[in-house]
Curated annotation (Swiss-Prot):
PANTHER family: PROTEIN NRDI (PTHR37297:SF1). It comes from the Bacteria. NCBIfam families: nrdI (TIGR00333). SUPFAM superfamilies: Flavoproteins. Belongs to the NrdI family. GO terms for molecular function: FMN binding. GO terms for biological process: protein modification process. Disulfide bonds: none annotated. Probably involved in ribonucleotide reductase function. Transmembrane segments: none annotated. This is Protein NrdI. Pfam families: Flavodoxin_NdrI (PF07972).
Length: 130
């Protein structure tokens, strides 16, 4: 079972992850130790930047990061959910989804499918017998 770790400033990301059926959901600032692979869901701040709290968390635990999703607001144009682009590039992980504000039911469905895909792919790498 994969854990979803999220960072939320206004509550949009928390509302999004709470709509999913994932059982193990933890917030970045309430996570004192991570020792299993995880998917990160974060927000975008200022003009397309990764939040400082997310960046600090990743400095310690990026080696366990499987993929990233991000929230944003489409009024920011090219900076919409840009934190996902930055994290993906910096840590060489896939962008699983970008969603506006707290997302729609379709966003939750697409995110869930992508998480399942990346977890399956990761499991196959760890257990090459499959």
């Amino acid at each position: 079972m994969v854990q979803i770790i999220f960072d939320s400033k206004t509550g949009n990301v928390q509302r999004f992850v709470n709509k999913t059926d994932f059982q193990l959901i933890r917030k970045v600032d309430e996570t004192d130790h991570v020792d299993t692979p995880f998917v990160l869901v974060t927000y975008t701040t200022n003009f397309g930047q990764v939040p400082a709290s997310t960046q600090s968390f990743l400095e310690k635990y990026a080696h366990l990061l499987l993929g990233v999703a991000a929230s944003g607001n489409k009024v920011w144009g090219d900076n919409f959910a840009k934190s996902a682009d930055t994290i993906s590039r910096q840590y060489q992980v896939p962008i699983l989804h970008k969603f506006e504000l707290s997302g729609t039911s379709k966003d939750v469905e697409l995110f869930t499918q992508e998480v399942e895909r990346v977890v399956t792919k990761s499991s196959a790498k760890m257990d090459p017998v499959k």
